[in-house]
Amino acid sequence: MRFDGAQAGWRETPRPGCTLDQRDWLTRGGSLTAHLARLGRVNVRVTREAVDRPWFDEPDALASSPRAPMWVREVILSVDGMPYVAAHSIAPLAASKGVWQAMRRLRTRPLAELLYSDPQVERSALVSRRVIAGHPLYALASHALLGARAPHAFVARRSVFQRHGKPLMVTECMLPALWRHLDAHGDGPRSVGSHGGA
């Protein structure tokens, strides 16, 4: 399964200028939270669950109208108390009451409990981009820094999951603390106290 995010600046190959760590994490398959769990204890903090309109660069990927109501879930993934990822997940409202209804009951459990344990779920290719001020994801990521100064740009990735033909898109924005950890410690196994995905 594929979707074309190029018109909105998303691309399958990370842009030139990304570090090796960034290229690695933007293209890793599987559950992002499972990868984070290799770095330390993972905590999922839900910051918003609501009915909303899609962002400007989301309708095409979801094959939906720009005004179609969506169910939105936003979380911060922290490792040992430090925010590493801001995640934004979105599904058509009708699908969130149907094939994706379990996403409404997750609370602080990771979304990956739904995405990676069900053989009926298919995933698109990962796409990525730099995120600068003016994109709603930049505001979401900046807020996750708890007052720390935001960088000029973040890097983020997204993919679309489908179950019975109904889409759920997950966008994951990596925060500066993740890159600092990798610079200092690499990403080898440490305590694994959590599993799952954004």
Swiss-Prot record:
GO MF annotation list: chorismate lyase activity
Pathway assigned to this chain's UniProt record: Cofactor biosynthesis; ubiquinone biosynthesis
Family annotation (Gene3D superfamilies): Chorismate lyase-like (3.40.1410.10)
EC numbers: 4.1.3.40
Source domain of life: Bacteria
GO CC, alphabetical: cytosol
GO biological process: pyruvate biosynthetic process; ubiquinone biosynthetic process
Chief location of this protein within or outside the cell: cytoplasm
Intracellular or extracellular location(s): Cytoplasm
InterPro entries: Chorismate--pyruvate_lyase, Chorismate_lyase_/UTRA_dom_sf
Family designation: Belongs to the UbiC family.
Entry function: Removes the pyruvyl group from chorismate, with concomitant aromatization of the ring, to provide 4-hydroxybenzoate (4HB) for the ubiquinone pathway.
Protein name, entry field: Probable chorismate pyruvate-lyase
